[in-house]
Regions:
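Conserved glycine-rich cofactor-binding loop
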Residues: 14-16
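Active-site helix of classical SDR
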Residues: 122, 158, 166
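Short C-terminal tail/terminal secondary-structure segment
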Residues: 147, 202, 207, 224, ...
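Short, small/polar-rich loop/turn modules that mediate ligand/substrate recognition or access, typified
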Residues: 174, 179, 234-236
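A glycine/serine/threonine-rich, flexible loop-to-helix segment
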Residues: 175, 182-208, 218, 248-249
């Protein structure tokens, strides 16, 4: 299937922030590749939702932390749409254990999902992006990963490495019309009012300069901008979307 619309692959898009990103990009006119690792029903539900925007949605299940599966996800999307123009590396795992209690197997599993998946998928989608003279690669970090994630050292390592990858891709592929950026979200309890009002979030809310917590619209709106032609001069940046809890200078 060939299409004049741009196509985005959003990993981990069967729920939460990934689902919100899918809605925003569908509203902007992009075809959507929904990916999940286990819950096909949830992924199919998101696909049905985004089709209401008049775009084509394809569900491709698979674990991006497995190289073969990650490559198959990309190949399936490319075969269906002709190319993947936007890659959003949203899938992540954040198991908690002290540094000394983290096994080699768990360490590798975290790095495979949180870091290596971004490498494997970039290698799959970049050739067409370069050939077409346009592309967007968007990844995620996080406030805790930036600070040093207590009880999740492997996550901090992976997210810092993705930041390095982002800068390297921005420099190498910028001349070809491909941008690479990374988003560092703040506290995002989701769009469920009951969940957002949970007492455990009260302290975080009161400490935020905006006196609120993040919603999927905050993330989706930024990614929609980055994927537009107006966002083409934003490249190699870490974008803090946290209401001012973490500031750069």
């Amino acid at each position: 299937m060939q299409t004049d619309r741009k196509t985005v692959l959003i990993t981990g898009s069967g729920q939460n922030i990934g689902r919100g990103i899918a809605h925003h990009l569908a509203a902007a006119g992009l075809n959507i590749i929904i990916n999940g690792s286990s819950n096909r029903d949830a992924a199919e539900s998101v696909a049905d939702e985004v089709r209401t925007h008049g775009v084509t949605a394809l569900v491709v299940m698979g674990n991006v932390g497995n190289k073969t599966e990650a490559e198959t996800i990309a190949k399936t999307g490319i075969a269906h749409f002709g190319a993947i123009d936007v890659l959003v590396n949203n899938a992540a795992i954040r198991p908690h254990a002290s540094f000394l209690e983290t096994s080699d197997e768990d360490w590798q599993r975290i790095l495979d999902v949180d870091l290596n998946a971004a490498v494997w998928l970039a290698r799959m989608v970049l050739p067409a992006m370069v050939s077409n003279g346009w592309g967007r690669i968007i990844s995620f970090s996080g406030m805790n990963a930036q600070r040093g994630y207590p009880g999740a050292s492997a996550v901090s390592v992976a997210k810092h490495a993705v930041w390095g990858l982002t800068k390297a891709l921005a420099v190498e592929f910028g001349p070809s019309g491909v941008t690479a950026n990374i988003i560092s979200p703040g506290t995002f309890p989701g769009d469920d009012p009951a969940k957002a009002s949970d007492p455990k979030f009260t302290k975080l809310l009161n400490e935020n300069p905006t006196r609120r917590l993040g919603t999927t619209d905050d993330i989706g709106g930024m990614i929609s901008y980055l994927c537009s032609d107006h966002g083409g001069f934003v490249n190699g940046q870490m974008l803090q979307i946290n209401g001012g809890v973490v500031m750069q200078f």
